[in-house]
Design a protein with these regions (language model features):
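Carbohydrate-active catalytic/glycan-binding domains of CAZyme proteins
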Residues: 1-210
Length: 210
């Protein structure tokens, strides 16, 4: 691991979601390894008006605070700029969402090119953690697919209805790059824990959002 290895996080801007996008900085926002984290797989999370960014590969995850215009990294109140928030078994692909006053931190485990790629999670009272690993909620199914991981989560506005979007490898596929983007329902039990996701071939039905 050194600063010559592949990685870098940039910022692009556009007038509408469909683009076209242009580089906002002319250089990477983060282009070096800090706390062992390869600068990839960024996720921006807004909490109480503040934007935080979680990122990192190589089994390390950092958290940074973004400026109001999202174009720079600024120090936290304690003066620290990069906070290591790496949970047990973390590999890459961090994701955060808030539900019922709790912070759900999710990540991918295993190697993306193998069958054991999967998604695990933790629940915390703060966006800073600590993030104690609870367990896997998405992993290979010998009847459906292997290598299920690197996800995002969608919530239907105004409803407690969640979906997980991820990639997986079809059964029998051997090429590392042979992956499919899929979506399935993600549900919670009465105590707020995420139920194991059941992969399907059908996915989910369209949902109209006003």
């Amino acid at each position: 691991q050194n600063d010559h290895e592949y990685g870098g996080i940039g910022v692009a801007v556009a007038d509408r979601p469909g683009g076209p996008y242009k580089d906002a900085l002319g250089k990477p926002l983060i282009d070096r390894i800090v706390n062992g984290a390869q600068p990839i797989d960024q996720f921006v999370f807004r909490d109480d008006g503040t934007h935080y960014m979680y990122y990192g590969g190589w089994h390390h995850c950092n958290m940074v605070k973004l400026s109001d215009d999202l174009l720079s990294v600024v120090p936290f109140d304690d003066g620290e700029t990069y906070k290591s928030v790496t949970p047990e078994n973390y590999v890459e692909g961090p994701f955060m969402f808030k539900r019922g006053g709790k912070y759900y931190f999710m990540w991918s485990e295993g190697g993306w090119g193998g069958p054991d790629y999967s998604v695990a999670y933790a629940i915390a009272d703060s966006p800073f953690g600590p993030f104690e690993r609870i367990g896997k909620i998405l992993q290979q199914d010998p009847e459906i697919a292997t290598g299920a991981g690197h996800h995002s989560v969608i919530r239907i506005p105004g409803k407690d209805e969640y979906y997980i979007v991820y990639h997986r490898r079809p059964l029998g596929a051997t090429a590392m790059g042979h992956r499919q983007t899929c979506i399935d329902r993600m549900e919670f039990d009465a105590d707020g824990f995420i139920k194991p996701v059941k992969m399907t071939f059908e996915g989910v039905k369209p949902v109209r959002i006003k």
